[in-house]
Amino acid sequence: MYSTKCTNFFLEIIFYVIFCTLFLLVLEKMSKLLSWIVIVCLFVFAISSKCSAQNYGINVPITGSMDVVLANSTQDQIGLTSTLCIYYPKAADTEIADPEWKATVTQLLLTKGWPTTSVYLNEYQDLVTFSNDPKLYCDYNIVLAHYTNDVALDISELAEFLLYEWLCNPMDVTLYYYQQTSEPNKWIAMGTNCTIKVCPLNTQTLGIGCQTTNTDTFEILTMSEKLAIIDVVDGVNHKVDYTVATCKINNCIRLNPRENVAIIQVGGPEVLDISENPMVIPKVSRMTRMNWKKWWQVFYTIVDYINTIITTMSKRSRSLDVSSYYYRV
């Protein structure tokens, strides 16, 4: 008979064999499970990255054997999410003489992707009136300015006025002297009749080439204008004189370009390129010219090229709820 020690030895061998077998089985199962988990994670990661991929090209053609150019299907339809204002002079409505012409224009713009509820045709009396109180409330604003010899300068200053944001404060010339401190610092005069006179002062507040007590000796900068952007020598105090009853003048700082505004000059020998004005920095390209024919032809052309015009602009991105001294024009 086997001894007790021998029996225990065999039992220990059987126990370790069973234990090792079970351990190997569990280890094999766990390794398979971990492998499956790793494989599934890699598969899900690879698939999700492809699904969320975005084609950032704009109207990029697909080259190869295809015969057509396919536009990017993710490109936004601007007209569906934006508002468009077109400002036109009263003379246009008078010439067209059709009570339904606005409806016709909006229906034509619908064919270009602009819903009738997103388009507003706003009339202004003349450039002078419009420049004194421009209301540019849409995401995209297009101003039609009819060129005539007597309003050439008005268009030029209106363009500079509208294509930039201005931070302005009213000037009290009866109490204070004023100076311009930098290139963006201008004085803007608006009203029915603005004649601006100035007398530059030295460090002792004595007039340079003029008498501070005699406005007849002041230098005349503007004469009977409705809108004037005034530039004087920086860093020099000036005594200013103007007719308060028919004009108001503000001390302004030119800020960022108003990229949601474009001006179309209708008629004239050539477009008034305000970017050539040394007062205008940086250069702008949102002003163009259209041949003058009839107002119906003007609006047909606007409709035909509306989306091309919009591409030169940027949608309004900031609120109009600002202080009364901040002219978002």
Curated annotation (Swiss-Prot):
Signal peptide bounds: 1-53
UniProt GO cellular component terms: host cell endoplasmic reticulum lumen; T=13 icosahedral viral capsid; viral outer capsid
Annotated binding of Ca(2+) 2, by residue: Q180, D231, V232, D234, D304
Pfam families: VP7 (PF00434)
InterPro entries: VP7, VP7_1, VP7_2
Source superkingdom: Viruses
Main location: virion
Modifications after synthesis and translation: N-glycosylated. The N-terminus is blocked possibly by pyroglutamic acid.
Keywords in alphabetical order: Calcium, Capsid protein, Disulfide bond, Glycoprotein, Host endoplasmic reticulum, Host-virus interaction, Metal-binding, Outer capsid protein, Signal, T=13 icosahedral capsid protein, Virion
Subcellular location: Virion; Host endoplasmic reticulum lumen
Function: Calcium-binding protein that interacts with rotavirus cell receptors once the initial attachment by VP4 has been achieved. Rotavirus attachment and entry into the host cell probably involves multiple sequential contacts between the outer capsid proteins VP4 and VP7, and the cell receptors. Following entry into the host cell, low intracellular or intravesicular Ca(2+) concentration probably causes the calcium-stabilized VP7 trimers to dissociate from the virion. This step is probably necessary for the membrane-disrupting entry step and the release of VP4, which is locked onto the virion by VP7.
Family: Belongs to the rotavirus VP7 family.
HAMAP family for the chain: Rota_VP7, Rota_VP7_A
The name this protein goes by in its record: Outer capsid glycoprotein VP7
